[in-house]
């Protein structure tokens, strides 16, 4: 991977030699350090916590401001290669996501390869950085939703849909890791490193404390149910989303995450208060779309088979 970054820096130097001297100088300086001692350069970049003085990050931002598709592609390749090495500090993630959003300010005019690269980077960020939560997570996912909804290129919109399926699963799987970290706490020293609560979910039985990843899943599931019911989301800045697609996302969640619902009553409450009502509504009137009706029926079958013990009354209502 370090060798790959050196090659990408060389390509960026060559591409910016004539038109973009600021980017070229930054790339040349970083390349010289990299060739002299790659391990030391990686260590120094990893230890730099100030985004404004992070050499690689600032070079990438400069390159993305050129509006040259080739230069931007090379910069995003560098960004993608740096993520598994965690060269970028956690404090830089907001800058990274803001930069990607800037590139999509006019999706129809953004280079296709740049759009595809952005989708890959978002997935890599979610897998690598545990603290992509809350607003950062919302903004990261919106990059994918924007390309899914607005890209005019079929390969981009289909890739965005695939990445969204994958990324939603990653968000839910992070809750399992968070739960396991609490299960592993056996002494005060371990408790010090445990995540701090970020909010509560108000349930009829009383409030439930939410930790970062659990809060993300709670808000995301709420949003998916709202969008399936034709209502605007709150965690995600989305007013609408293709109903067949949002039902597909819900089906993926319910198919693979039943054990998570058993441990988290706030998620079961969403099934009761949001999922079952919109399914009852969808099945009680003539279907506007055959694909929506079929997907709604599949969700009902899933609830009957996998969640009947958690939502007994709601299941009875669905069977009437």
Predicted regions: what they are:
Residues 60, 79, 100-101, 141-145, ...:
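Extended amphipathic alpha-helical scaffolding regions
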Residues 98-157, 162-163, 167:
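Extended alpha-helical scaffolding segments
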Residues 1-24, 29, 132, 142, ...:
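Eukaryotic intrinsically disordered, low-complexity segments enriched for acidic and Ser/Thr/Pro residues
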Residues 59-63, 99-106, 146-148, 227, ...:
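Alpha-solenoid HEAT/Armadillo-like helical repeat scaffolds in large eukaryotic proteins
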Residues 87, 143-152, 166-174, 186-193, ...:
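Eukaryote-specific, cytoplasm-facing alpha-helical/coiled-coil scaffolding segments in long proteins
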Residues 1-2, 41-49, 86-94, 107, ...:
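HEAT/armadillo-like alpha-solenoid scaffolds in large eukaryotic assembly and transport factors
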């Amino acid at each position: 991977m370090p060798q790959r970054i050196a090659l990408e820096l060389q390509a960026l130097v060559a591409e910016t030699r004539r038109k973009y001297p600021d980017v070229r100088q930054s790339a040349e300086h970083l390349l010289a350090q990299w060739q002299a001692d790659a391990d030391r350069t990686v260590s120094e970049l990893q230890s730099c916590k100030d985004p404004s003085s992070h050499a690689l990050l600032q070079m990438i931002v400069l390159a993305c401001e050129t509006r040259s598709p080739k230069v931007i592609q090379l910069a995003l390749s560098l960004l993608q290669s740096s993520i598994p090495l965690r060269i970028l500090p956690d404090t830089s993630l907001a800058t990274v996501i803001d930069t990607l959003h800037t590139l999509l300010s006019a999706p129809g005019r953004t280079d296709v390869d740049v759009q595809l690269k952005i989708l890959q980077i978002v997935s890599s960020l979610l897998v690598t950085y545990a603290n992509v939560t809350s607003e950062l997570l919302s903004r990261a996912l919106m990059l994918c939703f924007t390309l899914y909804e607005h890209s005019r290129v079929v390969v981009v919109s289909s890739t965005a849909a695939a990445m969204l399926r994958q990324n939603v699963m990653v968000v839910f799987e992070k809750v399992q890791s968070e739960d396991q970290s609490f299960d592993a706490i056996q002494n005060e020293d371990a408790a010090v490193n445990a995540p701090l609560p970020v909010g509560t979910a108000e349930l009829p039985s009383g409030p439930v404390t939410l930790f970062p990843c659990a809060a993300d899943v709670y808000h995301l599931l709420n949003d998916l149910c709202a969008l399936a019911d034709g209502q605007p989301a709150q965690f995600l800045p989305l007013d609408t989303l293709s109903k067949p697609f949002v039902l597909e996302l819900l089906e993926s969640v319910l198919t693979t995450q039943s054990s998570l619902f058993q441990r988290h009553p706030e998620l079961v409450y969403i099934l009761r208060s949001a999922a079952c009502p919109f399914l009852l509504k969808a099945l009680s009137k003539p279907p506007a779309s055959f694909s929506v009706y079929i997907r709604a029926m599949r969700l009902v079958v899933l609830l009957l088979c996998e969640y009947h013990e958690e939502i007994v009354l709601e299941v009875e209502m669905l069977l009437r």
